[in-house]
């Protein structure tokens, strides 16, 4: 598989709603009505299915290491499911679906007709590699031992007119899915209570069935009731879990006794005002609690009046998502859909079920409509139109399927009081250009500036949770007009609306989050939360702050097919300024700071707006600088001579106390040490005389043994002393690399050459030695080195230094120029060869730079693209 990060690919085939009452499981609803039809089956899905091998091997699934996501279904349930699945699949024939034109290829309905192979996974990150063979003998042998009491009465509650077979004459088309009758699916996808609030996964040939089953509690309620405290504490305004800030949700699936979703629990309190912005209407925490308590009390009162054998109460519901992910991306696609959609949608339904008995009421309503349609012999399309129009739950499933399949945000109103938004976070940028065998995504932002990775934030943990807080040194680039976003925020209302509106008015792409916090008075943590909210919901993008000293080039990944449309939009936004083709042509030349394109100070804000427009559309990208410390052979030799002298001195100090009575062996060792000392001294003298232009004659100077001794380091025999090296990670330098760095610093001059030139100006005059504008020129490099060295790892862009270290960019680039940073601008700084210790390149991709640094040819310009020099 390619290393290129791919955008969300939901691979959705269908969504199924299964409920279980005391009468047994029920196949309530599924969408689309016929996933195998030409309209329901996507071309990508067909190509994936036909490209897979049919070797007869099943899927392998690995148990999750998480205790919350682990667990296993009972053998009895699995045996019953397998037995029913086998018996039904052998008897079924062609299913009649309205509008379907796939009868000719029905023999390949994902392999469900003839060879149904299944594996049940307890959750976790599954890996589907081949398949388990069709164990029909095993199904028959173990099927007789099944014991599913709750499903025993299912037949009496369902159709009695020949519906037991898939090809029954009176079976309506909506009572089958993927070529199998509904009673097979309702038993297969109705797990035991051991799966309560855990990832339920079933693999059947090329399809994966993923759900998050929810069971009623033993006391008949759907939420754990907290004991009332004597002193009522003032409760903050909060919403149900899983809303628009649900992407920051860290609560795990708690067991029934530790229900994290209950009132007063962490579930509700963690998502303060989470669903308010850009959603219709919401309930406060106190209102939700009162409604939930009233609903539970009513449920208890009604249950007391009902007979113990009452069959009209729901005990479980399971919303199952049917997926067909690519084989090599199976775990990744399953995980992203489970974490972002399946689990959150089921939690929202659980919350509404506990509050208003929502799922059970809607399930009964859908069943009633289906029974009426069966009596009237309504067509499939007509029935689904009625269901979507009259049932909010059917409409919610319809909305989720269509929106998530298109990688859009699904805004789902469950009731007048609650609306949720679900999405799979899209890919906003890529550090790679697609190769010949990879699918191209033109227009995607090409950069390695990741606002949350440990590379861009050294203080971040290496194993960071998804959707972590944005780095404080990044800025916010709105992806739509500010007035439009403000209008939507103000219209949505909610607790977040005033804070978001205030932040949007203060935010600028030229100011980092930390700078906005300092000037506006908004706490940094609040700004990071609001910015994360906007980024997650596709209203903004986190970027390095725009600056006139930064360099921008036309992105190699820009979508030139949209140039004509973009030119018209650009002309409407900036009618009196150079056209889009002219701006792109100017930025395609020799890279230079963006400030050189600005005609005057009066045009500064306007040209920043142009740059923001170009970045928003992926037309340009920042040309970033990367550097590593170069260790020359002279530095290596000096360190090696010092190391060998230290070893000889250490040996001589140990041998001196032995006195004149030392043994012959000691004498031989002493003579050997003297020989090494002589060789080191001769090499040192040779180097010093070579540096001064003189050559001191020395006995044995040209001996091969002495020459061989100084070809490799004493500390690392694999390190050559005759070639230059790069220090990959200065903050994790090896002992030998640390000695090299010490030697480099020791050779820095105490007084910079530029300081001598500026000394005549005086300390108080403009441009003199005491001028802060010249601090980068006049300050000794030994004092500046500790601040800068941690960025010379080839991974951190040097443009970060002024932002992170709160330095003026002019000062930072003066120091980098002294260290050997190559720029396109001519500089008047007098350079000292002793300070030129960097090898630098400019590119958008630090991975490419890392590869270039590793091969390190003598002429590094030979591998750097022309536009990156």
UniProtKB/Swiss-Prot annotation:
One of the GO BP terms on file: negative regulation of TORC1 signaling
Disulphide connectivity of cysteines: none
InterPro entries: HTH_NPRL3, Npr3
Biased composition (Basic residues): 223-236
GO CC terms, sorted: GATOR1 complex
Compositionally skewed regions (Low complexity) per UniProt: 61-73, 85-98, 680-689
Region of interest called Disordered, as start-end residue ranges on this chain: 30-175, 222-266, 652-700, 751-773
Residue ranges with Basic and acidic residues bias: 237-250
UniProt family annotation: Belongs to the NPR3 family.
Biological function: Mediates inactivation of the TORC1 complex in response to amino acid starvation. Required for meiotic nuclear division.
Protein's name according to its UniProt entry: Nitrogen permease regulator 3
The organism's taxonomic lineage, starting at the top: Eukaryota, Fungi, Dikarya, Ascomycota, Pezizomycotina
